Regions:
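Short acidic, Pro/Gly- and aromatic-enriched capping/linker segments at domain boundaries
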Residues: 1-8
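Short, Lys/Arg- and Gly-enriched loop/turn segments at beta-strand edges
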Residues: 27, 86, 102-108
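Histidine-centered active-site/metal-ligand motif
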Residues: 60-62, 104
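Short acidic-glycine-tyrosine-enriched beta hairpin
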Residues: 21-22, 50, 81-99
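A short hydrophobic beta-strand segment most commonly corresponding to one strand
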Residues: 93-99, 105, 109-123
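A short beta-strand-loop-beta hairpin characteristic of the jelly-roll/cupin
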Residues: 62, 68-89
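Short, acidic, Ser/Thr-enriched surface-loop or helix-capping motifs
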Residues: 9-10, 71
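A short glycine-rich, His/Asp/Glu-containing loop-to-beta-strand
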Residues: 13-60, 114-116, 122
Length: 123
């Protein structure tokens, strides 16, 4: 299992990175067969975020905090300062961690509202 990290490059820019999620076989709950489970990442909350139909692009921005994002509705494109662009559809998980510098651009590629879960991290 993987997620995409949008991180700072150390010189005020941002870049994409593929991150492998380590999992171990665990009896996750009683009376069920073992499943693969990752370590728990401490979070401080959860917010549903919706970009209304008239918001198609954000411009360059850093995130408000270090957070995981899970796409719920719509197709998003993120662009990093190194010129790379990636598209993300519902179900995609991203770690948005480019707190330093210019950040990234977010675009909505589909019509209508687009939404994601923002999960601020405690660490």
């Amino acid at each position: 299992m993987r997620y995409v990290k949008v991180g700072s490059d150390g010189s005020g820019g941002s870049r994409f990175e593929e991150v492998e999620v380590g999992q171990v076989e665990t009896a996750y709950t009683e009376n069920t067969p073992p499943v693969l489970v990752s370590r728990v990442i401490p979070a401080t909350g959860l917010a549903w975020v919706t970009l209304p139909p008239d918001v198609r692009e954000t411009g360059w921005h850093p995130p408000p905090r270090r957070q995981f994002v899970v796409i719920l509705e719509g197709e998003f494109e993120l662009e990093t300062t190194d010129g790379h662009k990636r598209r993300f559809q519902p179900g995609a998980a991203l770690l948005i961690d480019d707190l330093d510098g210019q950040g990234h651009v977010t675009r909505v590629l589909t019509g209508g509202a687009a939404s994601f879960l923002a999960i601020p991290l405690a660490e």
